[in-house]
Amino acid sequence: MGIGKLSSAQGVSMDLKEFFPESGHIQRLYCDRCNGHLDLVFDDFFETVSGVEISISGLPTLHCPKCNEKYLPDDSRFAVIHLHEQATKMSSDIVKVTRHKTNQNFGFGTVPFIYDSDDYKYIPGLKRAGDQGFLTPVFFNREVLLKYDSSPTYRLSFASTTYGEIRRGDDFSMPFGLNGNGKVVMWLGDIARLPETEQYYLRSENIESDHSIGSEFYDGQIESVFTALSKEDDLFKARSEFLEACFKKFGSKVAHLDKEVFDLSVTFNAPIVDTDKERRHVADTLNKIYLESFDNKVLGAVVKNLGGDPKSLGSIKRLQKFIELSCPTLDASTIMNPFYILYDLRVAYSHLGSDESGEEKLQYVSVRLGIKPDSGLMEIYPSLIEKLHESFTKLTKAL
């Protein structure tokens, strides 16, 4: 049994030595069995430890939701050790206590945010010698990010669909993450650096902690571990870098994430089956994220400032004109090719089975991607994702 790991059967006798850490051992937020992230839960502990029956109600415990393993955080193990020592001194073989939550106010700022000080104290990696409470996780509805995406002062930058930064100018950034339950997580100390008006806005979307912080956000911020991105996350990151480059050059946000698009980007995964329903879902979702999210009004204004006339141009043609004028060193038609293919893919999949035009357009999509004309979704999808990524990357470098 590993250090701090709980017995699978409650009531099985344990040796007190099991609660003392081995030299160099540090309890981390990863399961020993599956390496998945652990959540903080408050469990009832009932074990016989070296002859003393110890019962603790609400003991902070780390739980793996994947394989149901449980581990004790360091302070919980020390609590068991302390209770055993007290019982031994009093010649008692039974200890029964109810733990009360710490409910500590760490004193960051004047806005009363909802957070759980137990998260800071019991989630591995958050406690620091200085700035006590700085890394306390504060949880929000994910709609909280939409204001910053539409704000003229702030902007969002994504390293992946679940890890990003809120930026202001070139000298301020605040990291955020999305946990496995779709909640936005930020650090209490970072929030306190915001103007008070912004803190009150955040407070309006502030929710109770669900004690689940394992994510790319945690891995990067606490463990300095950056896992390889999926092709979907890598494409979304490339889009974000392009939008950031546009903002720095033109001072305008040429695309936005409304609630629907943001939800789609967070939950979207690569297709695993080739069905009519999956085809339409993939094509519609990619269109909404990578085409429809462009702000035609802003693109038109930039085109006009660069000497072009956007009046007679539709949305996709307006994007092409923007590229022609802002990136003259690039072949705009080549850069735009994946975007036209994406548009045609949705049209093709929406007409399949109803007329021949859908099948013809689908073959044309495959030909332009450089794959077999009769290719299905499982061949088209990875090729299109790669082409879109190439275009965003080239655009960012050209800007």
Which residue stretches match the model-derived regions?
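A glycine-biased, small/acidic residue-tolerant capping/turn segment at secondary-structure junctions
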Residues: 356-366
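Short linker/helix segments within small regulatory modules
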Residues: 46-61
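Short cysteine/histidine-rich zinc-coordinating motifs and their immediately flanking basic loops
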Residues: 42-48, 76-83
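Short cysteine-rich clusters marking metal-coordination/redox-active sites
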Residues: 31-34, 64
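Short secondary-structure subsegments characteristic of cysteine-rich extracellular domains
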Residues: 365-379
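Cys/His-rich microdomains that often coordinate metals
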Residues: 35-38, 71
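Amphipathic alpha-helical interface elements
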Residues: 11-25, 68-70, 74-79, 88-341, ...
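Residues immediately within or flanking Cys/His clusters that coordinate Zn2+
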Residues: 25-28, 61
